[in-house]
């Protein structure tokens, strides 16, 4: 295997240990006494493609199941999956992306449970909300029935093979939004299952969130008391983003753009008034987009209230009642800018920390804990207290931070 050049230290390609990889994170965890309070990661990932042999066994359609299983026999990615151009490992420099196959985990645990537990402890995380990685792009799959079959299989596999065996790992299950009836059935089937703490819509897709076909699903989720989240991603196939010639541009814009589109439709079509008790969360878009969109929508609304007859308040007031994951959190040199953003979104009660680990731009809990303008109570709310209320979690810390030599 060709190795990235490194003149500073020797790189090994035959071993990998999350505790060693994240030893500085563990040092932070000890120094900041994370063991004294709850930390919940509302957005982390695994690479479900490494277990397609298991996942695809859950596909209900015999034709699609056979095609999917035959596709992975020949190596490479599955022939059933759509994919996106991307450079997540930055030319191999993100070594955890390709060395994780050497991670040693306890034999009595599913591999993904073992790997997830190791990095959680290293960071000082008590609970982690786990999402897929390649399947985040299924919303633009050209075959709706394939998305439905693959997502149904993944959800059942996740619930039965992962969530049922590790109480520290939770998830908000993928809703196949391109088929409204299938999305509704997913909520009916999985609400109340062990580890299922809500439901998630992948944001890169071209279905309007205000379509009446989804209203019964929103109502059902509202009745469960669980949150509905929109998980951002990018798509280089989006026509406007095809003008970008570098991954950095597509990534920076795409992760904001799709959630901005869905948020705008959610607000101007009066869904907060229609479902006032539905807890809505926006994941992995950072924070600045929300601050900006609040101002833009308020400015237009005050001149065109007739366009939004269902609204009784300014758009920003509804947005302040929603929840936002922190990562990838912008870090301006002038911290007063970040402080203003926190104030605008009511971060003390509406912001929830997320790592996005193991992706290339992940954040540690210290991005929140070390902010000078936050009081201790606000830090603890953002790092775990608010998420514990959202997900109905025990607030007793259960992490086991490894010792650092």
Regions found by a protein language model. Name each.
Residues 3-5, 149, 163-170, 175, ...:
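Catalytic pocket-lining loop regions of alpha/beta-barrel enzymes
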Residues 139-145, 191-194:
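Aromatic-lined carbohydrate-binding/catalytic grooves of carbohydrate-active enzymes
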Residues 143-147, 368-370:
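Short glycine-enriched, charge-decorated loop/helix-capping segments at active-site entrances
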């Amino acid at each position: 295997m060709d190795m990235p050049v490194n003149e500073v230290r020797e790189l090994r390609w035959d071993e990998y240990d999350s505790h060693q990889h994240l030893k500085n994170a563990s040092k932070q965890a000890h120094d900041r006494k994370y063991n004294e309070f709850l930390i919940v990661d509302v957005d982390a990932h695994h690479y479900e493609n490494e277990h397609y042999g298991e996942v695809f066994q859950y596909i209900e359609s015999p034709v699609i199941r056979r095609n999917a299983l035959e596709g992975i026999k020949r190596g490479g990615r599955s022939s059933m999956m759509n994919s996106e151009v991307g450079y997540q490992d930055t030319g191999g420099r993100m070594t955890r992306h390709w060395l994780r196959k050497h991670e040693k985990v306890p034999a009595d645990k599913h591999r993904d449970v073992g790997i997830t537990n190791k990095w959680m402890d290293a960071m000082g995380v008590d609970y982690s909300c786990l999402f897929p990685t390649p399947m985040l792009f299924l919303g633009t799959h050209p075959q709706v029935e394939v998305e439905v079959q693959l997502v149904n299989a993944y959800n059942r596999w996740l619930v039965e093979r992962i969530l049922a065996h590790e109480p520290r790992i939770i998830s908000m299950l993928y809703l196949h939004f391109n088929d409204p009836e299938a999305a509704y059935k997913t909520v009916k089937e999985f609400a109340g299952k062990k580890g299922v703490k809500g439901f998630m819509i992948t944001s890169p897709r071209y279905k309007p969130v205000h379509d009446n076909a989804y209203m019964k699903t929103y109502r059902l989720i509202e009745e469960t008391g669980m949150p509905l989240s929109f998980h951002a991603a990018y798509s280089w196939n989006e026509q406007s983003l095809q003008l970008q010639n570098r991954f950095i541009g597509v990534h920076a814009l795409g992760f904001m753009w799709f959630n901005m589109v869905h948020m705008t439709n959610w607000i101007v079509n009066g869904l907060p008034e229609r479902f006032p008790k539905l807890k809505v969360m926006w994941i992995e878009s950072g924070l600045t987009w929300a601050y900006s969109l609040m101002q833009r929508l308020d400015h237009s609304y005050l001149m065109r209230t007739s366009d939004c007859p269902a609204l009784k308040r300014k758009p920003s007031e509804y947005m302040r009642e929603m929840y936002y994951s922190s990562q990838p959190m912008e870090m301006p040199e002038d911290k007063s800018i970040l402080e203003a953003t926190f104030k605008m979104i009511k971060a003390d009660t509406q912001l929830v920390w997320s790592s996005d680990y193991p992706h290339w731009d992940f954040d540690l809990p210290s991005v929140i804990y070390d902010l000078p303008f936050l009081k201790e109570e606000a830090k603890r709310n953002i790092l775990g207290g608010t998420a514990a209320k959202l997900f109905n979690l025990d607030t007793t810390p259960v992490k086991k931070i490894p010792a650092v030599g």
